[in-house]
Amino acid sequence: MKKTNITRNHLTFLAAAILCCLFAAGADAADGKLRIMVFGAHPDDCELKAGGVAAMWAKLGHKVKFVSTTNGDIGHAIMAGGQLAKRRTREVKAAAKILGIESHVMDNHDGELMPTLENRKALTRLIRDWKADIVMGHRPNDYHPDHRYTGVLMQDAAFMVTVSNFAPDTPQLNKNPVFLYLSDYFKKPNPFAPDLVVGIDDVVEQKAEALWTLQSQIESFWSARNFETVIPVPTDPAKRAAKKREFTQAFGRRTRGTADRFREKLIELYGEKKGRSIQHAEAFELCEYGRQPSPAELKKLFPFFGEN
């Protein structure tokens, strides 16, 4: 009898331990925190288009991962190949640390991304592994082929993430994420029409600080506006500080432009007073693939608007 009691005690302890493990394993899904994945074609696209909103989600404890679908290995006037790919990966990892998020760079050559079955499966696995509630990426009409095909691949994954026998090595998602597009200026076949415009005034300096880590782009395309010239970032402290101020002001003009461009939407979402006062913004358009949230659910997924 005594031996039986010990056995039962052991079984009770074991059952309790198993339950604890199960609850711990599901903690991320049950903690009420959102999981967001943003796809950009190059190691800077996510940071440029969604760095502000990512920092805001992160401050609220939500989990954000930026994914570059190419390694950026030709995005410089002089440097290229593996050396540049490694440099740009280091840069976006540093930017992610500033924003309070995670970063991943896929090993596809810059300028050579194709909407292949292999890449469709790769994006599907990434979304599933992250257990994403929200997925964002480029629209498929864009000036750069890598941007276009990133958009196509995201659209293709929008349904396949729920199909159990597609890429069956990762469990399908039982709830389809909400998919959204990052902003752009292209008009044909249809212009970007945001469903959400988020004021980022409180984090615009944090976003600029993250972008400042992308030195390979600052010294090349962002400064020279071509891929033939390098304008090195000064090493002299005073000149470097002046360059940083110039850089911060330039990107401030971009986010101010977004706020001004979509002022009426800001007023609709934030109310008249707040909507008119916002100086810096990022904008996102709902994709017609994936889960179609109500306006009320969208505001829960983007919990930045308050009551108006």
Predicted regions and their residues:
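N-terminal secretory signal peptides that target proteins for export/translocation
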Residues: M1-R8
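Bacterial N-terminal signal peptides
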Residues: H10-A24
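Active-site rim/loop-helix segments in enzyme catalytic domains that contact anionic ligands
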Residues: D28-W130, M136, V152, M160
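Short acidic, glycine/proline-rich loop/turn micro-motifs
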Residues: H76-M79, N190-P194
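Active-site adenylate/phosphate-handling loop in enzymes that bind or generate adenylated species
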Residues: L126-T170
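Functional cores that coordinate and move charged inorganic groups
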Residues: H147, V152, D156, F179-Y181, ...
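Active-site cores that bind ATP or allylic diphosphates and position pyrophosphate for catalysis
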Residues: V163, L173-P177, Y181-L182
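C-terminal accessory domains and tails appended to enzymatic cores
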Residues: A167-P168, L173-K175, N190, L196-N308
